[in-house]
Amino acid sequence: MKTFLPGLMSASRKLSAWIGLYALLVLLALYLASCSAASHAPLKQSASDPAHSHRMTLSDHEFAPVDFEPQPGDTITIRNRSDISHSIYVTYPDGTMVNLGVQTPGTTVHWQVPADAKGEFVLQCWIHPIIRANLLVNAANLSSSAFKSALPKFTRQEILDGRQNICSSRNRRA
């Protein structure tokens, strides 16, 4: 089929290509702007969140805030706000460890405090052990003797042996 206006068709195709490219760039800019705003917006607890839900953020070097006392059954939501990955785990008072998995930047993880929880729970990053938070659960119903019994017990000799192992491993030469 022969067209009567070949110059007009090629101009129309060029215009369509430019409009499509422009639309693609606008969509890409909007997508990047929404991602940037979401990752830097402050994380606030909304009024619709139940009272038994706590939110924390994980930055490059710390958990924040840690100014609440969770109760059994509470849910703790942790959002990775840093630009690096973390791998969070929780150590229970009896020494049990629960791995919450790897958190890439911008992701969120949830942990529910066990229904029978009492004592100190430690949140820590496998990759960056200096990043940790201690949460005292059910503090009102925790007697000091019950808390002390939850701590690991070591004999004097075990402590001395442990100290000796640490000191001797530091002094070893490769």
From Swiss-Prot:
Q: Spell out the InterPro entries in the cross-references.
A: Cupredoxin (IPR008972), MauL (IPR034242)
The domain of life for this entry's organism is Bacteria
Task: Give the pathway.
Answer: One-carbon metabolism; methylamine degradation
Q: Which residues form the signal peptide?
A: none
| Coiled-coil portions | none
Query: What's this protein's function?
Result: Probably involved in TTQ prosthetic group biosynthesis.
Which protein is depicted?
Methylamine utilization protein MauL
Organism (species): Methylophilus methylotrophus (Bacterium W3A1)
